[in-house]
Amino acid sequence: MAPKSACKNALAQLAAELSSASKRDTSSGSTRNSAPELTSLLADLLLSRDDVPLEDLEATTARSHLAKGVFAACKLVPFPVAEVAVRLAVRAIMRRVVVPWQAGENFSMIQRVREAFLRLVDDFDNASKTELNAPFTQCSEYKDLIGGWLTQFGNAVVLTMSEQQLLDDAGSVLNPPEVLAPLVERYPLLIDHVMVQEGMDYLGGKLQSLVAYHALLRCATRPHENGKVPVLAALTMVAEYFDPETKPAYRKVPQKAVAAFDLNLTDEVVSSLVYDQAAAPVVQSEQPVLPQSESLLFTEVVRTRNMLALVQPSATWEGSGAALRNAAGDAKRRQQQAARGAGMAWRCGVDALFSVPMEHVAMNVPAVMQMLHEPPTDIPAEYERALSLYATDTIDAIAKFPDLAASSGTEAVIRSLALRGFTKTNCERYLFAAEAFLEPQAPGTPLHDFYAAVIYASVVGLAAHSLYAYNQHTIFYPEKYSRVLKKTVEAHAYLLDMMGLAISDALISLRAFAPKPPHQAFRTVRDTLAAVVDSVETGAEEFSDLIVSDYVQRLTADFYGGIHENEQWLSERDAAIRQRMEIAAAGRRETDSAGRRPGLGFHELAALVQGLQIGGKEPKAVVEYATAPAGAASAGATFSALFAAAIVRDVMEGAAAIPFEADALARLNKALSWLRDFGLSWNMPDGSHYRRRVIALQAAIHPFVTGKIGVDAVTVKQARALETAMGDLYAACEYSFQALPPPYVGGLRKAAAPSRQHSPLLAQAYTNAAMGDLGVLTKTLAKSAEEISKTVRDMVSRLLSARDLFSRRATASDKNAVTIDAAGPGGTVLGTWEDESVMSGLWKTVNFTEAAIRNTERAVRELEATKRETQDLEESYWQLASGRDGAGNAAQPSESLYQQVAAELVEIADARNAVVVRARSLYRAIAGTGLKRIRTFVKAWRLFLKAERSLAKQVVQQQDLIDALDPSRS
């Protein structure tokens, strides 16, 4: 069928077509045995895959006209066909209704769906009474199902909207499956409905986002023997959930969390978390010289007792120092900060890290980040043991995730990660730091094991949290699952390898997050659908088979059902249907009168088939032939086989010759619908199941016919699906050809199987896919390379400025000021600044460069995420170039295009790998040399400043000087 207009109500269009066809058949005096056009339109209604927007369903006129059109058609089509259509029409419409749950107005949406559905049922009831003089009773159970599901969904929505009540009722743990399970378990027959799938996905995402939140909230508001744990849990929760850009935006900081934070933040806890740099006699070797941004943020929160300062810093607070060009203004701001106590700093180092229970270590973000930025040296033996024990405990806990999920669900895994400090935000922080700054350690050392545990937990945690944002029981999840693993686990494969870990280790731990489609519910729909259509009296077996086989095709292609299992199910059903039809045929032969017209002979039948016009009306002789007693089962099978071997094959050959263009595909789809529906009105048998293959071919071209996907955007996977569907249809035609009696075979020519070598349709589909794949990958490479190049240029420019500063002469005064001259004797004086302004400017360079490194690594990971896709495409095109199909079967040699594409994919992969390696080498070199030297310089200045302050006493003793200059004596 031609693509529908985007502005046209789909229901109104079908209603108009039904009305027109009914008028034509009525005026021509058609009977129930001769309404092929109406039968075809009813098949379109029951088989359509087009979405029905809620607004279309709410359109009163369109809805009413469609109901009238359906029942007007049912008066003219064969009774068994009408019975199937009446029983399934409402479901066929509701199955495709799309509801915008994400809009947030859930209660009004539920009411709109309920009202539109009830009015649809009323319209069908009124039309049934008008056209058939009988009430519409076939929808009572389905009506209860829809109403019950909407009520259940509304109850679940109430829980998510009343968040505090939900958390209070949850007690110790929040268990989303308790809320979501009834939506499937009580209503399995609705599982294939679009609004149900999208509703489960939407609601699951909202509920599951609260699991880690609830666990952290309980930890932050409950007493703990270590007073720092509730404080760190509160900060972890704020960082994860209360950033202004974090969704859902409706969540607010619970008042009890604020009260608990203030209560837990005693003077003792504060002093154990932060210290006053000015009061400290020297800088501890494990303390940061000028703290990282995380340290400054966390310190500000504790100092001001303001939780939200972690994600919403005050406008006057600055954590990154100042540039030399703004030194004067910065000095004034620094004085204001000092007056407010801005000299506080977060306690870092292994002793601070392990001052909380081992299972909460990763909540101490500044301490972990400092470990990743600057590996500690001279670690005491007791802390080496602690590092090793932490690594063992963390990796063992993650290894048990599959067992934990099996007993308590994936939410237990999410809770475990969150309470260990591995929230999604923290995982991203730790991985960024490891990617940019981590210095490799000797394998087997405690520090190496600690880093391995943090990286491993961060990779697994990032993947787990990303996957848990979706409902793993919906049909949308498998694609998201694959995409998330590419962007998380596969993107960090090199980090895992550097730590002596493999991707398989992480994937095993994430096994519980694999897709889990509700196969039993889908099978229930399949079995129930078959039972409904099979309960209709004999005469609509082929029409019913269309409905059932279409669902099975969607079950295997879209719902990830087992192919072998469903093929076996179809085979068993076919046997039962054939047996029923044979019994019915035998009964008719016994009761039919002997005076009926005999079946057509060879010449008449051949002439009848030759006279068929593709897309035209079915000749009345077809019906007469089919209903003749002498031409019963065997004669009907002969005609069906001849139709498939001649007409269907002609259409297939014509399809292979058309261009891969939207208009041509629309015309092909219309011809395929005619093939699919030919003979349905008189139950023409289909021994080769060519109708099923036609449906599969229509499914392959459907996205391009409707415009959901442009023909230029076809992928190699979709091109393969098209080739497979055409090959299956050809096989069905060949089966019919072989089943023909000898007299018919001689008049038919042999036909070649469709192939990309001889079919413009397939060749152009693959060509478009090749150009599209190359274009997308080339654009991705160019964009990432440009982004990386720009960031690296900025980094190098900043470091060159720092190097230029170090090349100049600097003269210090006794007023804590530095005068900087141009390099060389007699250089021009550039200016005089406070020494702290100079150091702050240098540290801003460090902070800027670190941020640039993180941005570069993000771009590198996005680029590296295309690795698997490129490999898959490369393999596909080499197969095409070698003349082999997806199963490895030999075919004819292919055009050189596929070889060229495969070769270019290799070049793209090489270019990508070169960019990744060079970018990582460059920013690691910058982090390991330039930044390290600036840090060392600033650290030396801080040490000297502390020493100077420690000497600022009325009476200075010799030991004071020794202590000040030797930090190890502190």
Curated annotation (Swiss-Prot):
Organism: Psittacid herpesvirus 1 (isolate Amazon parrot/-/97-0001/1997)
Name the UniProt record assigns to this protein: Inner tegument protein
Encoding gene, per UniProt annotation: UL37
GO CC term, one of those recorded: host cell nucleus
Compartments, record wording: Virion tegument; Host cytoplasm; Host nucleus; Host Golgi apparatus, Host trans-Golgi network
Top-level taxon of origin: Viruses
Family from the record: Belongs to the herpesviridae inner tegument protein family.
InterPro entries xrefs: HSV_ITP (IPR034738)
Region forming the signal peptide: none
